[in-house]
Regions:
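C-terminal alpha-helical cap of glycosyltransferases
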Residues: 413-435
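A short, active-site helix/loop in glycosyltransferases that binds the activated sugar's phosphate group
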Residues: 188, 193-221
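Nucleotide-activated donor-binding/catalytic signature segment of Leloir-type glycosyltransferases, i.e.
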Residues: 295-315
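Conserved acidic donor-binding segment of nucleotide-sugar-dependent glycosyltransferases
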Residues: 368-369, 373-380, 388-395
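Short hydrophobic beta-strand element within catalytic cores of glycosyltransferases
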Residues: 352-356
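A conserved mid-protein helix/loop that constitutes part of the nucleotide-sugar donor-binding site
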Residues: 256-273
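Aromatic "clamp/platform" in nucleotide-sugar-dependent glycosyltransferases that forms part
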Residues: 316, 335
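A short, well-ordered alpha-helix in the C-terminal region of glycosyltransferases
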Residues: 382, 389, 396-410, 419-422
């Protein structure tokens, strides 16, 4: 749908009476005299995200949620004990589309969904109805990218459809052992039902081989990269290493233990003994889970540096493109990856890469010795050695940057579309066989 963008601002909010608002950070409290009427919650762009309504006794009774384009998307009604009783999702014109009711039971709360005057006892049932509606006419292909919202339903359709199971992460619980018994729990049900899918798609050739080795090559397995580099990127003039921040490295990822940023810092501490002006910029929101383990490890690693200011933690950013253009080397030291689009994007802008040998994306995206280096899975010393090797030889660094630009053609729109073509050909064969 082509929906006009008309964001709701605080001055557009109408409580039906004249109100006075008092600012409290991203919250604006609405009053009529001394009577508290409601709370307006803004996004970081000063757009209305939701409006909370309160009764004369200070009890929350309704919340209205708004899309960033300016229309209301969801209404919620609350019980006197501050529990959601009813939720209604709206279309762009404000018409109710889906209603969800919560009914207290002895064991908790029961959910009831209503759509098109039909009642469903669970979200799974509602999704099955939705997919059946999509599948009513013609021959259809469904791609499951999020298994928990579709895997069971797409095997229960009233009319056959061509169903593709898409793996966008590691299938096993251990990235170093694809045959380990314990599977990635996000995919477990789908993996136990491998014979029911018409096609299985993974993002790298190695993962496709591992899938066939474990579940049998009788399955129709295809390799399609997760990421695509827009054609316009290949028309941009390359940025030479000499025009970038000197001796600069970059990592953009969720700051979590499994991303190994502490190991990058430890490697940097070693490398700076040879090249003292090396720097590392880290971007990503901090995962404070597991008793803040990620930051504890990072803070310990920072103590190994001769100068802690060599590492800067910037927090999350939405605009990573300029960072890829201003830095020279991109770092990965992860425990598990499914592809790593950020690495692909950095390479498309000429960044040289250093990664540990982690499946599945980085050890496919990085061609060792051409556009970067791959070191052992846990080898911090080797990681540091490659930092020194790259930044000790400007000519090599530039050559690898040139290669990074060239090898990014593997993920152009044209090349990725070619990877999809065998799947569509198999879909056509499925249609003919069914006729």
């Amino acid at each position: 749908l082509d929906i006009p963008t008309n964001p709701m601002r605080i001055q557009d909010v109408d409580f039906g009476v004249d109100v006075e608002t008092k600012e409290d950070g991203l919250h604006h409290m609405a009053y009529v005299g001394e009577h508290f009427l409601g709370r307006i919650v803004l996004s970081s762009e000063d757009i209305v995200a939701r409006i909370e309504y309160f009764d004369p006794y200070g009890n929350l009774y309704q919340v209205s949620h708004y899309d960033s384009r300016g229309f209301e998307t969801l209404k919620q009604w609350y019980s006197p004990d501050n529990q959601i009783e009813v939720e209604v999702w709206l279309d762009v014109n404000g018409k109710p589309v889906i209603e969800k009711t919560y009914t207290p039971t002895r064991s908790g709360r029961m959910e009831t969904w209503k759509v098109h005057n039909r009642t469903f006892k669970s979200l799974d049932e509602l999704r099955l109805y939705f997919y059946n509606q999509l599948n009513m006419e013609g021959d259809n292909m469904f791609l499951i990218d999020r298994t928990n919202v579709a895997e069971w339903q797409l095997l229960q359709l009233d009319k056959p459809a061509y169903v593709v199971f898409v793996l966008h992460n590691h299938q096993a619980s251990d990235a170093t052992n694809p045959d380990i018994e314990l599977l990635n729990d996000n995919y477990e049900w789908s993996l136990f039902n491998m014979d029911n899918w018409d096609a299985i798609v993974s993002s790298t050739p190695q993962q496709t081989r591992d899938i066939k080795n474990r579940w049998g090559d009788h399955h129709k397995c295809f390799t399609v990269p997760v990421g695509v580099i827009p054609e316009i990127q290949f028309q941009v003039d390359p940025i030479p290493m000499s025009a970038r921040k000197h001796h600069s490295m970059l990592a953009t990822a969720r700051v979590a233990p499994e991303k190994g940023m502490d190991k990058m810092i430890k490697a940097l501490a070693i490398a700076r003994k040879t090249i003292p002006d090396l720097t590392l910029d880290l971007y990503g929101y901090v995962d404070h889970g597991n008793d803040d383990l990620a930051m504890k490890r990072i803070n310990e690693a920072l103590k190994e540096l001769d100068d802690p200011s060599a590492v800067t933690l910037h927090g999350h950013t939405k605009d990573v493109g300029p960072l890829h253009e201003s830095h020279q080397v991109y770092l990965i030291f992860s425990q598990m990856e499914g592809f790593n689009i950020a690495l692909m994007e950095g390479q498309s802008k000429g960044m040289v890469s250093i990664t540990n040998d982690v499946s599945y994306g980085p050890n496919e995206l990085v061609k060792d010795g051409l556009n970067g280096y791959i070191v052992g899975y846990e080898d911090v010393e080797a990681f540091a050695e490659k930092m020194v090797e790259l930044f000790s030889d400007d000519e090599k660094l530039q050559t690898m940057s040139d290669n990074a630009y060239d090898l990014s053609n593997r993920y152009s729109e044209h090349e990725v579309w070619k990877a999809w073509e065998p799947i569509f050909a198999d879909f056509e064969a499925w249609i003919e066989a069914k006729a």
